[in-house]
């Protein structure tokens, strides 16, 4: 894997810097690295593809070295270099695609394609060895079963979940109380509602709670907490739990009271925040518990009192909500996040070449299915294919 990265980095630098008019002295070190790559690759043969509709391609390396010059690089020099660069880039692209479409239930962190296995040989270590990138460093750590650490921006840690629970229900669905939520990606939105605005509740207060268990532990997380859930702030028709009918939800938004957020690890509370909104942090956690209250306003103007009558019918439905958004965090496992396109790259290649469903990944690389059952085998394979996708993105956008 590190050799593949070094190949890509050398080719990217060569493609960007070996251009007509450049002083040779400015790129002499790069050309030496480029020539070392050619010397190492010459005389070797590789084969890629042969899975799904990914075509079999044979690769043979027999290229001349780039020479020296005291002057600027001319058009002939650059054209010769460009022909070599294009062939190598095409080769790296196909090695990456060949690797991205393969999976294994055992040792999925290791190269799975014949071409990448061959590149892992000791003879290729002379190719401008460079393992300074974060993703290569983490791949090497995972390969040695040492602790990794990935920094994510808006990590897709929550499987998609959208539903509701009713704590009070009537056959006519005209006086309900309960909770509804939407968990997806890096965000939780949860709302508590009471059609009667807590008129008969103790102290005219309804208590709500929402617990979310993560599939992986997050550390040093920066989080935004807001006293609102905008996705539940407009009217909607909701299908009943048994699917037999529908009920109407017409929210009027109140501010949640006595808000408490707990971050837990293995059942133990690590961080607690009470009525603190904006930016908060959590050290390490695998569970989030949100609790909040809906309190009937003790004093209301006539206009507000008309919204919340003392008896049915309840045309407007008192609602309070919270939004919790993970802005950044560190995780030992690889995840999709807002800064990367690796999941999209891997999925696109697998779809384009009609790769058959394998023993590890869910059909279509569906992220909710993948993260819901994030097994060690999936973790290993995902880190490998994401690493390869990152390397490929250096050359192919």
UniProtKB/Swiss-Prot annotation:
Keywords: Calcium, Capsid protein, Intermediate capsid protein, Metal-binding, Ubl conjugation, Virion, Zinc
Residues engaged in binding Ca(2+): 266, 286
GO molecular function: host cell surface receptor binding; metal ion binding; structural molecule activity
Key word Protease present: no
Alphabetical GO biological process terms: fusion of virus membrane with host plasma membrane
InterPro entries attached to this UniProt entry: Capsid_hemagglutn, Rotavirus_A/C_VP6, Virus_capsid_a-hlx_vir
Modifications the protein undergoes after translation, according to the UniProt entry: The N-terminus is blocked. Sumoylated with SUMO1 and SUMO2. Sumoylation of viral proteins seems to have a positive role on viral replication.
Coiled coil: none
UniProt xrefs under Pfam families: Rota_Capsid_VP6 (PF00980)
Main location: virion
Location(s) in or outside the cell: Virion
Region (Interaction with the inner capsid protein VP2): 62-73
GO cellular component: viral envelope; viral intermediate capsid
UniProt binding sites for Zn(2+): 153
Additional information: The VP6 trimer contains a zinc ion located at the center of the molecule. The zinc ion is not essential for either trimerization or transcription activity of the DLP. Zinc-depleted VP6 has an increased sensitivity to proteases.
Subunit: Homotrimer. Interacts with the inner capsid protein VP2. Interacts with the outer capsid glycoprotein VP7. Interacts with the outer capsid protein VP5*.
Family (UniProt): Belongs to the rotavirus VP6 family.
Annotated function: Intermediate capsid protein that self assembles to form an icosahedral capsid with a T=13 symmetry, which consists of 230 trimers of VP6, with channels at each of its five-fold vertices. This capsid constitutes the middle concentric layer of the viral mature particle. The innermost VP2 capsid and the intermediate VP6 capsid remain intact following cell entry to protect the dsRNA from degradation and to prevent unfavorable antiviral responses in the host cell during all the replication cycle of the virus.
Protein name per Swiss-Prot or TrEMBL: Intermediate capsid protein VP6
């Amino acid at each position: 894997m590190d050799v593949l990265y070094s190949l890509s980095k050398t080719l990217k630098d060569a493609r960007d810097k070996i251009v007509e008019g450049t002083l040779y002295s400015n790129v002499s070190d790069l050309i030496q690295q480029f020539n070392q790559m050619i010397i190492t690759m010459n005389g070797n043969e590789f084969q890629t593809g042969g899975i799904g509709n990914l075509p079999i391609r044979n690769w043979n390396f027999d290229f001349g070295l780039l020479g020296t010059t005291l002057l600027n690089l001319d058009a002939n020099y650059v054209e010769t270099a460009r022909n070599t660069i294009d062939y190598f880039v095409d080769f790296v692209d196909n090695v990456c695609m060949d690797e991205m479409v393969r999976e294994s239930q055992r040792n999925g962190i290791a190269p799975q394609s014949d071409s990448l296995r061959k590149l892992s040989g000791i003879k290729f270590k002379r190719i401008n060895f460079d393992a300074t990138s974060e993703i290569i460093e983490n791949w090497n750590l995972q390969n040695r079963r040492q602790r990794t650490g990935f920094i994510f921006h808006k990590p897709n840690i929550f499987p998609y979940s959208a539903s509701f629970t009713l704590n009070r229900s009537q056959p006519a669905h005209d006086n309900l109380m309960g909770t509804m939520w939407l968990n997806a990606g890096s965000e939780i939105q949860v709302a508590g509602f009471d059609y009667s605005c807590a008129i008969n509740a103790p102290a005219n207060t309804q208590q709500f709670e929402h617990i979310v268990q993560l599939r992986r532990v997050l550390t040093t997380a920066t989080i935004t907490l807001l006293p609102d859930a905008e996705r539940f702030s407009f009217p909607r028709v909701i299908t009943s739990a048994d699917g037999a009918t529908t009920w109407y939800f017409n929210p009027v938004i109140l501010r949640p009271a006595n808000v408490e957020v707990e971050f837990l690890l293995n059942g133990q509370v690590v961080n607690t925040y009470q009525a603190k909104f904006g930016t908060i942090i959590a050290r390490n956690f695998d569970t989030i518990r949100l609790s909040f209250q809906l309190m009937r306003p003790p004093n209301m103007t006539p206009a507000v009192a008309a919204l919340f009558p003392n008896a049915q019918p309840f045309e407007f439905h008192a609602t309070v909500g919270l939004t919790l958004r993970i802005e950044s965090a560190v995780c030992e496992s690889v995840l999709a996040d807002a800064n990367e396109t690796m999941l999209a790259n891997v999925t696109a290649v697998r779809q384009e070449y009609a790769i058959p469903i394998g023993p590890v990944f869910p059909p279509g690389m569906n992220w909710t299915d993948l993260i819901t059952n994030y097994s060690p085998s999936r973790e290993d394979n995902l880190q490998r294919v994401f690493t390869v996708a990152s390397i490929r993105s250096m050359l192919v956008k």
